[in-house]
Amino acid sequence: MPARHLLGVVVAVTLSATGVRGSFERSADASQVQGATPAAQSPQPQPAQPPAPPAEPLLGPGPSAARYPKNAEEFDEYFKKVSNWGRWGKDDERGALNLITEAKRKQAASLVKVGLAVGLAHPPITERTPDNTNPFEHTMNRGFSTDTYRVSYHGYAHSHMDALCHILYKGQTYNGYSQAEVNTEKGCTKLGIQNMRNGYVTRGILLDIPRLKGVQYLEPGTPVFVEDIEAWEKKAGIKVSSGDALLLRTGRWARRAALGPWVVSRNEAGFHASVAQWLKDRGVALIGSDSALDVTPSLVESLNLPVHTLAITALGLNILDNQDLEALGEQAAKQNRWEFMLTVAPVPVTGGTGFPVNAIATF
């Protein structure tokens, strides 16, 4: 059975008037995923669950209605089909970031018309809740006024970016690097978040499926298929093109505000695995959502987080997890503009499996 591994770090940072001191500790927690070796926690996998009853696509029957891939065997075939391994050379560590050209950055800059910026990070959650098993910790020292932040950012609560060494499939990372070659106690020797040191500046597109359906939020477990994306393109008058960043709003934070937190790791709206080929065909360079991207249960028998695996490990796509897209959705609707300049710049920790980020959308 295919094995997937998740890697993560715990971050402690001390800020003072005289400088910044940081330390990065390898998480002591381990997860076992379908026979995987010990791994870290973002998003923290759950034991494989029985297949969920089939669910119809949001907009009725269509090419994705067959829900391919449906099981581990089909997933393995699909992984090979959509893989970008070797596309930018056998030593590549940037993945789909290669799709963001100078011309693409200029196009993104041209989208700034009114100069209004919207931050996409959700405020750190300091309480232990069903969707936040690793609360953000903040302590302050009196006198010289220094403080310490401690955050295990991978998971279902804190806004962060996943590096390309975060997930392995069958013992390999993106571009075919082996687990033995990449994983060390001091971080990843390949594909670490430092490869994103110059950040992302590109055209961002908000995919607002609740607005498409005329609801405030999608119910947990709702899958988003290719036909849903294309229906939104038609409604919004936009088309996803090479080098774009695609952000999926499911309304997770709106639902949380209305009904309270729930165990998102077991039941969340998100993309179905069948969207991976479309993402490759359109040349999407960065992907994210207001949750952990995958629909859960996954609708792929015996597999958890198949979209994460396909995006990071097959396509070489960095992922923005747990973004707060509520204000962005409101501003986009107000302006009737669903495209904007998106900038994302994680701290370039050498060997890091990711980092907390506050992505900025500018209209």
Regions found by a protein language model. Give the residues of each.
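Sec-dependent N-terminal signal peptides
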Residues: 1-27
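Active-/binding-site microenvironments in catalytic and ligand-binding cores
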Residues: 30-363
